[in-house]
Amino acid sequence: MAVPSAQLRRDARLERRRRRIVEAALAKFASRGYTVTSVDDVVTRARVSKSAFYEFFESKEHCFRAVLHEEGGALIHEVLTEAATGHDHHARLRLGISRFVRECFERPDVARLLIVESVGLSEGVEAVRHELQARFADAVAEEVRNAMTHDAFYADKDPAVFGRAVVGAVSDAVGYFLTHPGVDAESLAASLCVIFAP
């Protein structure tokens, strides 16, 4: 059965409103921090009413979790998609690390939410952050697991530990250099690849 055009227009209008709220929340949480940012700040920037905000989100934290899940999830998806194009484990690891670094430098608001603002905020936010990190770490671990039998560098590495080490080190390096300029994304990615995918 076809959906009436009036319903389609209404759904599109609601989605545009929700998107404005998500974009405003991302900008505010990244620039001011979660604690300082209020729902009023978000709705003012989004140019919507508070009631519009609460149509989509139960609370400020619910909004933060949704933004982190959507925007952080999109970033991780880009990383894993590019990594999958590599012809071998070295190429896939290098592509994944490099894409993560570039995406974070190109989308610093998302990086700030994923790497800084979400840490220790609440159980719910931590669960989202850990799920996103696990997707990246699990992909790295799988590459290491497959490389152990034919690559001496990875032969003695625990895949799960190596995957988490990559995510931790890469995230920390990106977080540091986003707030302490002095290195570009390509140089940072190259340095990290020398360590983890020589």
What positions do the PLM features span?
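N-terminal intrinsically disordered/low-complexity leader segments
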Residues: 1-16
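Helix-turn-helix
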Residues: 20, 28-62, 66
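Generic hydrophobic, amphipathic alpha-helix propensity
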Residues: 13-25, 42, 67-75, 79, ...
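Amphipathic C-terminal alpha-helical segment
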Residues: 102-106, 110, 142, 146, ...
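Short secondary-structure transition hinges
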Residues: 95, 102-141, 152-153, 160, ...
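Hydrophobic alpha-helical connector segments
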Residues: 66, 80-109, 162-166, 186-189
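Short hydrophobic clusters on alpha-helical segments that form packing/core surfaces
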Residues: 17, 21-29, 100, 170
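Amphipathic alpha-helical packing segments from all-alpha helical-bundle domains
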Residues: 73-77, 123-150, 160-167, 171, ...
